[in-house]
Amino acid sequence: MNLIPTVIEQTNRGERAYDIYSRLLKDRIIMLGSAIDDNVANSIVSQLLFLEAEDPEKDISIYINSPGGSITAGMAIYDTMQFIKPKVSTICIGMAASMGAFLLAAGEKGKRYALPNSEVMIHQPLGGAQGQATEIEIAAKRILSLRDKLNQVLAERTGQPIEVIERDTDRDNFKTAEEALQYGLIDKVLTRNTEEQK
């Protein structure tokens, strides 16, 4: 059962009820709190585009608590984050794993955060193939190409040499918030909610 809290806001016209995500969106906060698939990506991309149309000069914050998911869906979010004019701040709450970690690192440099007890996990893309040998070969080439693309972006975002990224993403690589900071995946470990991150 998926319960979504409702908040009541008093206005001069009376009361207005919002689901919590719509209320957060008014403050330019987007929640990524699930596995990343096409539906989640479409929702995040739509919110980013909406907030850009509302005010292209004001920052957007994405709070991430995600085990990762589809590479193509994640890349749709990544490309939109880079495409829109507002700066996109990313904040890890809980866990940012796989594509979740990639999106965390994709935030505006200087505005990528994690809470003290959150974890970040990077690894190489997962995939499988079945069918004829040629189909398996095509799938293998594609996943290797995706791995190279993701590693290149991570190297650019973290400042780590590509060889270090390749080595460190070979297997599941878990990092504390402090370790993610040292690695360059984030820019600061947050202990208090301050205006500095907005």
Swiss-Prot record:
Disulfide bonds: none annotated. The active site is at residues 98, 123. Its EC number is 3.4.21.92. SUPFAM superfamilies: ClpP/crotonase. It catalyses: Hydrolysis of proteins to small peptides in the presence of ATP and magnesium. alpha-casein is the usual test substrate. In the absence of ATP, only oligopeptides shorter than five residues are hydrolyzed (such as succinyl-Leu-Tyr-|-NHMec, and Leu-Tyr-Leu-|-Tyr-Trp, in which cleavage of the -Tyr-|-Leu- and -Tyr-|-Trp bonds also occurs). One of its GO terms (cellular component) is endopeptidase Clp complex. It is an enzyme of class 3 (hydrolase). Transmembrane segments: none annotated. Keywords: Cytoplasm, Hydrolase, Protease, Serine protease. It is found in: Cytoplasm. Its main location: cytoplasm. GO terms for biological process: protein quality control for misfolded or incompletely synthesized proteins. CDD domains: S14_ClpP_2. One of its GO terms (molecular function) is ATP-dependent peptidase activity. Belongs to the peptidase S14 family. Cleaves peptides in various proteins in a process that requires ATP hydrolysis. Has a chymotrypsin-like activity. Plays a major role in the degradation of misfolded proteins. This is ATP-dependent Clp protease proteolytic subunit. It comes from Bacillus pumilus (strain SAFR-032).
